[in-house]
Amino acid sequence: MYSLNRLPRSAAFKSSANLLRRNASTTSAGGVNVVGFENKGPAATSSLTVAIKAGSRYETTPGVAHVLKSFAYKATASASALRTAREAELYGGVLSAALTREHLLLSAEFLRGDEEHFLNVLASVLSSSQFYRHELSELVLPVVEAETISSQAIPSTIALDLAHSLAFRRGLGNSLYANKNYPVSIDDVKSFGEAAFAKSNIAVIGTGVSTEALAKAVSNAFGAGTSSGSKLSTPKANYYGGETRVPLDIHAPATATPTMVIAFGTSSPASADLKVLKHLLGGETSVKWTPGASPLAQAADKIPGASAKAFLLPYSDAALFGVVLSAPTSAETKTLAQEVASIVKNAGEFKEEEVKRAVAKATFEDAASTETLSGFVAAAGPAALVGSVPEAQSFSGVSASSISKAAGELLKGKPTVVSIGNISVLPYADELGL
């Protein structure tokens, strides 16, 4: 096994914490926080994203955040949904909307120089969406229902959604998907949208455009159009934990396999130690067509068609850390779960050399994640909402002892266990020694 101490380290590795700050800058324009990220070389395209603090944790009615996301780019005071779509096509741009547990993200990607048009489109969505009743029934709800049904066909998606509900109950525990058993009215959407689209609740993130040019365009586009109400708020997240078991629907697609999630949570933001611990447990491979050398990868490799991967889902005031595992049959999933539980219970027992390798992986992942638009927005969104620029995580203080301490604190909490499959076969949490 090669030692990292013998390998030359690049300057980027040694100063990764400065990579983002080098080209990103922030300012305020007309009461809206603005973050611009200029490319080092000439770029033919630019992008704009409005980050709105209106994720599912802030919703006042179950599913209203999902419905509001699907109302994006419908009729506004200045254009119909058809006109908005056609003009985007004529400019060669792409409009999209995404929902996370903390943010609603409205994005536009386009040829450089067209930022004024697309910023006006985004501003009109926030300031003058009409929320017509016929659009809700004819255009929005069918899409919402289709997205919900699609998510229910993927056991891992169901398991992670249920895991959040068990771990955090309300707030972060709210589902990302609307449920037809809890109808959302047009008045619910209007009320939530009015609060969500307040200037104090949004930030604009631009890539391939200077902060100065972006700030000027934001001042012109947003002006006094958006409301200036107070921010949406939610109580601080608390971790609880729990267990639930769901039969795998006989109507599920053939690709659906028995799945389990074994997780633990924190009531504070994710630490550098947890980011490194995710790579220590692993499940992913660094070389294609090989099983991988991490404990989880080795465990899954014993069962053909099985997988076990560590995950870390960070939020502003909490985090969920765990393993999602699956196998072709419930009996095989039980066998894998027993080995995974043993690995998790010994998560703090790693050698210094193993920690160094995991730190290198975590540093690379942290830096590489911002190279894509979605990754940069995920990093810049929370920072922009508080008027700062995103910064890469520092892993300089991570060691085998700090990992052991972090893992010990994590495992003190009540586990969150979700089982999907043949529930007469899949193990209970106490049977796994958790």
From Swiss-Prot:
The keyword Lipid metabolism does not apply. Keywords: Electron transport, Membrane, Mitochondrion, Mitochondrion inner membrane, Respiratory chain, Transit peptide, Transport. Pfam families: Peptidase_M16, Peptidase_M16_C. Its main location: mitochondrion. The keyword NADP does not apply. Transmembrane segments: none annotated. Disulfide bonds: none annotated. GO terms for biological process: mitochondrial electron transport, ubiquinol to cytochrome c. GO terms for cellular component: mitochondrial inner membrane; respiratory chain complex III. GO terms for molecular function: metal ion binding; ubiquinol-cytochrome-c reductase activity. Signal peptide: none annotated. It is a peripheral membrane protein. SUPFAM superfamilies: LuxS/MPP-like metallohydrolase. It is found in: Mitochondrion inner membrane. Residues 1-31 form a transit peptide. InterPro entries: Metalloenz_LuxS/M16 (IPR011249), MPP/UQCRC_Complex (IPR050361), Pept_M16_N (IPR011765), Peptidase_M16_C (IPR007863). Belongs to the peptidase M16 family. UQCRC2/QCR2 subfamily. Component of the ubiquinol-cytochrome c oxidoreductase (cytochrome b-c1 complex, complex III, CIII), a multisubunit enzyme composed of 10 subunits. The complex is composed of 3 respiratory subunits cytochrome b (COB), cytochrome c1 (CYT1) and Rieske protein (RIP1), 2 core protein subunits COR1 and QCR2, and 5 low-molecular weight protein subunits QCR6, QCR7, QCR8, QCR9 and QCR10. Component of the ubiquinol-cytochrome c oxidoreductase, a multisubunit transmembrane complex that is part of the mitochondrial electron transport chain which drives oxidative phosphorylation. This is Cytochrome b-c1 complex subunit 2, mitochondrial. The lineage of its organism: Eukaryota, Fungi, Dikarya, Basidiomycota, Agaricomycotina. The gene is QCR2.
